[in-house]
Amino acid sequence: FNLISFKTAVENVELPLFYQGVSRKKRHQMAMEYLDKLGLADWAEHYPNELSGGQKQRVAIARALITRPQIILADEPTGALDSKTSVEVMQLLKQLNQEEGMTIVVVTHESGVANETNKIVHIKDGIIGQIEENLNHDASPFGSGGLMK
């Protein structure tokens, strides 16, 4: 997750805004908002070694989102999370896509996570296979027809 071990969760999330020249008060407020969205407000003053793997992952997600990038590359964004938190993270990513126009590219082996996306690109043995629209979120985990090509 590349969290800085001697900085608290909130300080880790604030860091990109520090380099953008955002005031201390504003970056702290924004970082707390993102930690709250990810269910970590109570853990803001804890250091990475005091957090679970899932909590560390959510801090890293908050840090990635705080600058409101145009594109997010999310490699297994729910990998270390429990099912409830996984749903919350995917809802947040969908919300950012719909409301703020962010492009979200999710890499996952989990069909349930893939099914939350609008388009699924199947890759097998490093080769792009089928690309399917998934606006109704009812895709088969193996592509249309149930087979990967």
Pin down the residues of each PLM region.
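Conserved beta-strand-loop-alpha-helix hinge in the C-terminal portion
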Residues: 127-149
